[in-house]
Amino acid sequence: MVLPKIKEVRAWFTGGATAEKGAGGADYHDQGNHHWIDDHIATPMSKYKQYEQSRQSFGINVLGTLVIEVEADNGQIGFAVSTAGEMGCFIVEKHLNRFIEGKCVSDIKLIHDQMLGATMYYAGSGGLVMNTISCVDLALWDLFGKVVGLPVYKLLGGAVRDEIQFYATGARPDLAKEMGFIGGKMPTHWGPHDGDKGIRKDAAMVAEYREKCGPDFWLMLDCWMSQDVNYATKLAYACAPYNLKWIEECLPPQQYEGYRELKRNAPPGMMVTSGEHHGTLQSFQTLSETGIDIMQPDVGWCGGLTTLVEVAAIAKARGQLVVPHGSSVYSHHAVITFTNTPFSEFLMTSPDCSVLRPQFDPILINEPVPVNGRIHKSVLDKPGFGVELNRDCKLKRPYTH
C-alpha cells in the first residue's frame, strides 16, 4: 500500500480571552456562570482573596481551544483539539509546519521527535508548547487511521478488554452513582491558607457523600496543585475513616520529593495520584520513581498519544496504573489497549452534573459518552478517532504559512 504524504497543516482556534465566556470545547474550563467547575475550587491562587472564589478570575479559561487539521495529498483530513488557542496556532503555522508537510502520513514518531527537539529551547517542561505538540500528534494519528481505514486503538495493537468503565469527576458523586459510574471524584474547596478548618470542611464533604453513596462506591479528592505535604497528609487522614480511594494532585507538578513523602506518609490503603500537569516523558519517569500509585497524564497536554503510550510503559514496568486525565476519545482509544488501565475518567461538564454532556462539547460531532458508566469498544470502531469537527463553531485561522 502506497501511503499519501501530508500536503498541509492548518491551525485554528475558538474561545479564549477574546471570546464570549462559555465557549467550552477542548478548553473545558471555559464554561458559563453557575457551573460547578468554577465554583470555589481550591487552586494555587486561592491564597489570594480576590482569586479564591473562581478559577476564571485568575484566567484559567484564557487560552481557548486549538484545532489542528492535517490534510494528505489524497484529500483526506485528520484533526484534533486541545487547549492552546491562538498562541498554539502561531507555533504550528510559523514553526512546526516544516516538520509536518511533505512527510508520509505514517511518519508520526519522526514528526513527534522533530517537534520535541526543535522546541526544546523554549518549551521547558511542558505547558502551552507541549499542548500544541500534543494536538498535532493526535491529528496525525487521526489522519493515519482515516487513510488506512482503522480506528486508532487498532493501530496501537487492539483492545485488551471489551469495554472501558469510568468514574466521574464532578461535584455530585451521588448523581454519578445513579448514572452507573464506578466512582466519583470531587474537587477540594479549601487549602493550607484555611488551616485545619479547611480540612474539616472538605472531610465533612467526603463524609456526606459516603453517607449518600454507600460503603462501596469509590470516592476520591482532586486537590489541583493547591496543597503542601503537611496539609495533604492531614487531609488524607481526616478522610480515611470515610474510605477515600485516592487523593489526587495535591502538590505542584515538580515537587517530586513532596510526592515521595506524601506517598510514604499516606494512610494505609489510600492511593496517591498525579500527572495531569506533567508535560515531558522525563517528568513522568521522575514522577513514577516517587512511588505514587497512579499516573494521570492528559493526552492533549503531555505530548500526545505517542508520549502517552511511552508513559503507560513506564508505569507498567513499575507496577503502577496509568489512568489518563479525562480527554474523551483521545484517551479512550489508548486506554482500551493498556493492560494497566482498568478504568478511566469521565469529566462531567453539565453545570450541575445532572446530565451527561460530551466533554469537549460543542467542538466535536459524534463524541461518545458512557452508557451506564461504560463505553463498549464497538463505539470506537470508526476510522481515526471517530469524531468530526463542528464547523458551526466560530473557528479562526489567525496565521498562515
Swiss-Prot record:
Molecular function (Gene Ontology), one example: magnesium ion binding
Enzyme class per UniProt: lyase
Residues of the site described as Transition state stabilizer: E345
Active site (record annotation): H325 (proton acceptor)
Free-text cofactor note: Binds 1 Mg(2+) ion per subunit.
Catalytic activity, as annotated: L-rhamnonate = 2-dehydro-3-deoxy-L-rhamnonate + H2O
Key word Endoplasmic reticulum present: no
Biological process, per Gene Ontology: amino acid catabolic process; carbohydrate catabolic process
Domain of life: Bacteria
Coiled-coil spans in chain: none
Swiss-Prot/TrEMBL site (Increases basicity of active site His) positions: D298
EC number(s) from the headed UniProt entry: 4.2.1.90
Cofactor: Mg(2+)
Keywords, ordered alphabetically: Lyase, Magnesium, Metal-binding
Residues noted as binding substrate in the record, renumbered to the chain: H29, R55, E345
InterPro entries in alphabetical order: Enolase-like_C_sf (IPR036849), Enolase-like_N (IPR029017), Enolase_C-like (IPR029065), L-Rhamnon_dehydrat (IPR023444), Mandel_Rmase/mucon_lact_enz_CS (IPR018110), Mandelate_racemase_C (IPR013342), Mandelate_racemase_N_dom (IPR013341), RHMD-like (IPR046945)
Binding site for Mg(2+): D222, E248, E276
SUPFAM superfamilies: Enolase C-terminal domain-like, Enolase N-terminal domain-like
Family: Belongs to the mandelate racemase/muconate lactonizing enzyme family. RhamD subfamily.
Subunit description: Homooctamer; tetramer of dimers.
General remark: Reaction proceeds via a syn dehydration.
HAMAP family named in the record: Rhamnon_dehydrat (MF_01288)
Function noted in UniProt: Catalyzes the dehydration of L-rhamnonate to 2-keto-3-deoxy-L-rhamnonate (KDR).
Designated name of the protein: L-rhamnonate dehydratase
